[in-house]
């Protein structure tokens, strides 16, 4: 069973928290709230823009892109339209882009903070055990692709696990029905054909992992990792009282780590 490796001086001082939850549970809104709540907090959003438009135009972004990332294409839409063809490609690319974003997360702001915290919008663990596993179980990845993905994921974590290991998880818990409604409201073109059955499968896996703790992983330390569950069925976007309440819950959670 894999365990988190020892960290460097700064990495050991920065608390790393993953914000997990179903599609459209409210993660992006939530991490934006956290970013504004404390000067010592930083967030790493999901790189959705790169999945929807792999080719980037800005010089700053292009300097950081690999050849595959400059090739162009909406790999998220391709996956939803033809999952049997593109699920493996998407999951490999999604995890790669997530790792690259999270490895860059310790910037000058965190180096100067007294109690630095970085919040990851999802983690490499939900990449594998929620989303990729669900696609494999739904016959959208074949046995060979799934085996290659797991082998690649294990190797990447051995190389970069020092910077990716978590101190805690915040689970934004919402029903599949509420998530489907939010998908329609936010209007992301690639997601408009997502069926409720897909969200139900993802919800079941999140519940098994973060509520019932019956989902087993290859990372032993995740079995005992502290988890804060926040019920987000009630819409909280634009509601300051809800922002304040959720922020206080997070501060209380961090104080226990």
Curated annotation (Swiss-Prot):
The keyword Magnesium does not apply. One of its GO terms (biological process) is deoxyribonucleoside monophosphate biosynthetic process. Expressed at high levels in adult intestine, spleen, thymus and testis with lower levels in skeletal muscle and eye. In the embryo, expressed at higher levels until day 10 with lower levels in later stages. The lineage of its organism: Eukaryota, Metazoa, Chordata, Craniata, Vertebrata. It comes from the Eukaryota. This is Deoxycytidine kinase. It comes from Gallus gallus. GO terms for cellular component: nucleus. The active site is at residue 121. Keywords: ATP-binding, Kinase, Nucleotide-binding, Nucleus, Transferase. ATP binds at residues 21-29, 182-186, 234-236. Phosphorylates the deoxyribonucleosides deoxycytidine, deoxyguanosine and deoxyadenosine. Displays highest activity against deoxycytidine followed by deoxyadenosine and then deoxyguanosine. Shows only very minor activity against deoxyuridine and deoxythymidine. The keyword Transferase applies. It is an enzyme of class 2 (transferase). Homodimer.
């Amino acid at each position: 069973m894999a365990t988190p490796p020892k960290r460097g001086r700064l990495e050991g001082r920065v608390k790393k928290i993953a914000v997990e939850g179903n599609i459209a549970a409210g993660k992006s809104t939530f991490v934006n709230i956290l970013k504004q709540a404390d000067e010592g907090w930083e967030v790493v959003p999901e790189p959705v823009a790169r999945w929807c438009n792999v080719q980037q135009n800005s010089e700053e972004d292009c300097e950081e892109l690999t050849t595959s990332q400059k090739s162009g294409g909406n790999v998220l839409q391709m996956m939803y339209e033809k999952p049997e063809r593109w699920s493996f490609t998407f999951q490999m690319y999604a995890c790669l882009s997530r790792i690259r974003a999270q490895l860059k997360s310790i910037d000058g702001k965190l180096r100067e903070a007294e109690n630095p915290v970085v919040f990851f919008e999802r983690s490499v663990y939900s990449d594998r055990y929620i989303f990729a596993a669900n696609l494999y179980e739904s016959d959208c990845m074949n046995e060979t692709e799934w085996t290659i993905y797991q082998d690649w994921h294990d190797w990447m974590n051995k190389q970069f696990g020092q910077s990716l290991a978590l101190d805690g998880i915040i689970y934004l818990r919402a029903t599949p029905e509420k998530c489907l409604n939010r998908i329609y409201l936010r209007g992301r073109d690639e997601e408009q054909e997502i069926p409720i059955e897909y969200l139900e499968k993802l919800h079941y896996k999140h519940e098994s992992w973060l509520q019932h703790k019956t989902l087993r992983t290859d990372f032993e330390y995740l079995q005992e990792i502290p988890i804060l569950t926040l019920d987000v069925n009630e819409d909280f976007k634009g509601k300051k009282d809800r922002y304040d309440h959720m922020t206080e819950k997070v501060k209380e959670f961090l104080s226990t780590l």
